[in-house]
């Protein structure tokens, strides 16, 4: 559920949605989502002063409350 939510949000922000990849790693205490986007779209995902990245993380925190799981978003340049 969380992976799909983040993928939908990010694909709406970028110019190259086909380049968006999300890898989920499940740990003992948290789930890590590694978001990979093209270099050209990295700024759009992070936003000015990290505003977009912060907003995405806030949505993740709100959505994860129902699942009782902790999610961490890592943004990686392609």
Model feature map: region roles:
Residues 1-44, 53-78:
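RNA-contacting regions in translation and RNA-metabolism proteins
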């Amino acid at each position: 559920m969380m992976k799909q939510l983040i993928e939908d949000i990010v694909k709406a922000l970028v110019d190259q949605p086909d380049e968006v990849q999300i890898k989920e790693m499940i740990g003992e205490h948290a789930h890590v989502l590694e978001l990979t986007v093209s270099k050209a779209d990295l700024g759009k995902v992070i936003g000015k002063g990290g505003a977009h990245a912060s907003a995405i993380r806030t949505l993740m925190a709100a959505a994860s409350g129902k699942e009782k799981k902790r999610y961490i978003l890592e943004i990686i340049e392609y």
